[in-house]
Amino acid sequence: MAKTRVLLVDDDRELVRVLTIVLEDAGYEVLSAGDQHEALAAAARERPDAIVLDVMMPEGTEGFHVVWHLRRRPEPYFQNVPIVILTAIHSATPLRFYPDSTDGSYRAGEYLPVQGFVDKPVEPPALVAEVQRVLAAARAL
């Protein structure tokens, strides 16, 4: 049986290395991307079972823009793939991505079509638990 595949997107190579080990130890096959362009290409090419995506990406683009581009694609895969956001942004920090949000909180998940959030610095058990949770929820649909 094939392993569940997770696309891990972060420009911090050391963090990617560490989180890859964490996710592989939990039984996942890990694919990685270092920026939004690589993330979009890898998602289209590899069709991972889940995506773990950093908020602050290089070139001035937030990871939320990657979510926006993925969810705009018409194929059902892109509408349904579970996405977990990694973020060091505190909830009081306003984000441009939330034009309808009344409080600018990154936890206003109803304004963003993602399934989970994990705070940075990442606690490995929290990441594994969140990936397991979003995958289980996606399979239950």
Each language-model region and where it sits:
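Active-site residues of response regulator receiver
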Residues: 54-55
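Two-component/phosphorelay signaling modules centered on CheY-like receiver
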Residues: 13-31
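Acidic, metal-coordinating helix/loop segments flanking the phosphotransfer/catalytic sites
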Residues: 34-50
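Conserved acidic carboxylate
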Residues: 10
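A Lys-centered signature of the CheY-like receiver
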Residues: 107, 120
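Short amphipathic alpha-helix used as the core "switch/output" element in two-component signaling
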Residues: 41, 64-77, 104
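His-Asp phosphorelay/catalytic-motif detector in bacterial-type signaling
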Residues: 47-49, 75-82
